[in-house]
């Protein structure tokens, strides 16, 4: 009976692993044209917000100051400047286009990831039976190992996720998530996450080892502490 259920469960596991990549690839192309049309229509029908106007004005002043400084260095600045150089107008237009493209890609990535998470959640909900079978396989495989191998795997997992060098890995993970959703990097959030999340995870793992694993296999806990303290 277990062998008959083996193939569907393995196929379900492969489906879950490949699902995010497939959804991202297919929906990116489908949503890109629709979001572009919506964004262009929205931009043409609405005025600039106060934040956008402020950013454009700051950019204009910055470019004007740089242009005047460049003319001063070249010795071409006149006593009275009647109007800003024509190049500033083109640069402002180009900057606005780039800014709009950034907003568009942010909306596109965010929408694609929300759809992917929704489909993935639905797949987990509909595939409860396969998840139960996979969970039973993992537990059976783990319990059939001797205590030394179990302790080795537990140490490997804990050191990988909460070890000395794990902070760099978690930083890469949070940066990848921000980049995948199209969000602007925030160093403060990165620092808080890297400093707090591994500590919370380490506490949960120690709680599991002390309370849960100690009831299942006291000898395994003894081996685990002996290896970790060596």
Swiss-Prot record:
The keyword Electron transport is annotated on this UniProt entry: no
Membrane topology: Multi-pass membrane protein
Compartmental location: Plastid, Chloroplast inner membrane
GO CC aspect terms: chloroplast inner membrane
Positions of disulphide bridges: none
Biological process terms in GO annotation: potassium ion transport
Chief location bin: plastid
Keyword annotations: Antiport, Chloroplast, Hydrogen ion transport, Ion transport, Membrane, Plastid, Plastid inner membrane, Potassium, Potassium transport, Transmembrane, Transmembrane helix, Transport
HAMAP family: CemA_PxcA
Family classification: Belongs to the CemA family.
Summary of the function given for this chain in its UniProt record: Contributes to K(+)/H(+) antiport activity by supporting proton efflux to control proton extrusion and homeostasis in chloroplasts in a light-dependent manner to modulate photosynthesis. Prevents excessive induction of non-photochemical quenching (NPQ) under continuous-light conditions. Indirectly promotes efficient inorganic carbon uptake into chloroplasts.
Name of the protein in its database record: Potassium/proton antiporter CemA
Gene source species: Triticum aestivum (Wheat)
